[in-house]
Amino acid sequence: MTSIIKLHTISGAMDESPPCYILQIDDVRILLDCGWDEKFDANFIKELKRQVHTLDAVLLSHPDAYHLGALPYLVGKLGLNCPIYATIPVFKMGQMFMYDLYMSHFNMGDFDLFSLDDVDTAFEKITQLKYNQTVSLKDKGYGISITPLNAGHMIGGTIWKIVKVGEEDIVYATDFNHKKERHLSGCELDRLQRPSLLITDAYNAQYQQARRRARDEKLMTNILQTVRNNGNVLIAVDTAGRVLELAHMLDQLWKNKESGLMAYSLALLNNVSYNVIEFAKSQIEWMSDKLTKAFEGARNNPFQFKHIQLCHSLADVYKLPAGPKVVLASTPDLESGFTRDLFVQWASNANNSIILTTRTSPGTLAMELVENCAPGKQIELDVRRRVDLEGAELEEYLRTQGEKLNPLIVKPDVEEESSSESEDDIEMSVITGKHDIVVRPEGRHHSGFFKSNKRHHVMFPYHEEKVKCDEYGEIINLDDYRIADATGYEFVPMEEQNKENVKKEEPGIGAEQQANGGIVDNDVQLLEKPTKLISQRKTIEVNAQVQRIDFEGRSDGESMLKILSQLRPRRVIVIHGTAEGTQVVARHCEQNVGARVFTPQKGEIIDVTSEIHIYQVRLTEGLVSQLQFQKGKDAEVAWVDGRLGMRVKAIEAPMDVTVEQDASVQEGKTLTLETLADDEIPIHNSVLINELKLSDFKQTLMRNNINSEFSGGVLWCSNGTLALRRVDAGKVAMEGCLSEEYYKIRELLYEQYAIV
């Protein structure tokens, strides 16, 4: 491999932080995932902010926030503008993840890291691919192709194969699963034969999973014991990834009449549950062969649930039939979303059960419950929620919003409560605005010229308007139509309302989400539902049973090491794992695979070029203008004489950086080749470049009317007077008497080479 390969580990190295890496192939910089954790840690964003304008492509491997959570922020706030590639399910389900993430945090506070508009803008830039579809990068990435392969972890999950033309391949494989599940097939790593470079994770290197049968029995036993004890079950799941496996499993369990679970309610609760299931119905071809064959044979969609109720709010859960409930709710970390709300309500009841299905980052509520949660333990939580504005607060909000939307709107006069009918009250009750007849100015002392008909105005005030007309009829006042009613909605022409991109509101996506989420035309601006944030500190006594049952869908440590032994990569970069887990994978690759192993630290840039004596040198414009190129077989070549130098090149940074950020911008150094003076250029022997085949040269001689024939591996020309034969080291020897034909054949021979 002659390309210079580097990897910058921005996040996800020697720890379990979200994956975010920059892979550099010569001058092409590719961002591999851009995850964000539950706390929205901004430390790695500072480093990524300096690199965002140097990126040439982005590859997304999974749809959850742990792999693409920072994408809306990069596009909406940092101005990321390069091609983004993902599979179709990652595109669709990724939107659902980010919608639900935004709404979950917005309902708990003022969330301003990104908006739903940023989510839509980011996902509009994604190029959607299918498995095994090879796409060539453009512009600077010319010559590099990418291919997505099935990872088996989530629907649409991807192992990326990156290949540069004429060179070996690079495989980016993290969070893969080799086991077949109910709704997904296993990964396809066996199709990759000894990759040149493998970038893989050590997340499960020291983790041993329970067998699938034991895991499922543990879940079913917990549910049965809880509901029969008149308790509720809260299952913390993600939005649109691993939840599909659990939902399909539980719906099948509820169909079994012998289980007796049909008497209890089963619900899926998140902000976009309806859309998640609808997307799952349309993506059967991305799932396991078993589901695909069942769908093709019986025409029965496996995600047409008969027992799962789709809920989008706690109010929907309360409307379910009375009695024990099993609720699949987001998010799995219990830091936000409906899982936190239900935890606050159900944790104190000893009959209830809380099931955690995945490992989360240290410091989250879910991790705290798993590590140290004895029965009766008290936990202090900040409980924040939004409530609708009412009464005076609602009136004040509507008045303020109305003035912001249109400063021409004048506050309507409040109906007089007093029965006083003084002349001043009558004057103040006159409706202000534009009139075609003369009216008395308000707030100004008046003379007796205007006669006030007090009794008439008190009963039924009537103001005659003079209609203005021109050659085409009555003049239309556009303001009358722009302000349609008092609710603050703007008037939109009918042709704008009939645009194809306007759809009806779907369950699970509210008015604000439809407006900001790109489902409604941007010209239609709907007011947010007026709410306020209420925060209080609560002490929760955890009496409910807390269990963690693994439904992560990743390969265990033992299986992962066996897969690495089968792949036999030449070089391995181990990322995304604890220091101990990283060393376990590194030692296995060194001892059993025989590969060069790299274990970078967070923020480190490592050079994994296969040839250690390759350097990248930039030619100056003056030197390039003096080169004399000779045309070869597939390219043009030239001899270069120059002096090696060093130039400093600053890394491009955003224009809106602060003073501290600007000072932290590092400068990169690049090697250059400078022009030599004429008396400094050394003399060199001519070099002939080409791999000549005598059979091809025989055709050249025939085109020039020179007879030739092979005999004993020698090409005889001119009736056997000249001989051409190949000697060692790829040289061609020419023997014969000096003659006119000798020089003619030699000239034709020289033309087959690029001489520099």
From Swiss-Prot:
One of its GO terms (biological process) is mRNA 3'-end processing by stem-loop binding and cleavage. The keyword Metal-binding does not apply. It comes from Drosophila melanogaster. Component of the cleavage and polyadenylation specificity factor (CPSF) complex that plays a key role in pre-mRNA 3'-end formation, recognizing the AAUAAA signal sequence and interacting with poly(A) polymerase and other factors to bring about cleavage and poly(A) addition. Required for the cotranscriptional processing of 3'-ends of polyadenylated and histone pre-mRNA. Belongs to the metallo-beta-lactamase superfamily. RNA-metabolizing metallo-beta-lactamase-like family. CPSF2/YSH1 subfamily. SMART domains: Beta-Casp, Lactamase_B. The lineage of its organism: Eukaryota, Metazoa, Ecdysozoa, Arthropoda, Hexapoda. This is Probable cleavage and polyadenylation specificity factor subunit 2. It is found in: Nucleus. It comes from the Eukaryota.
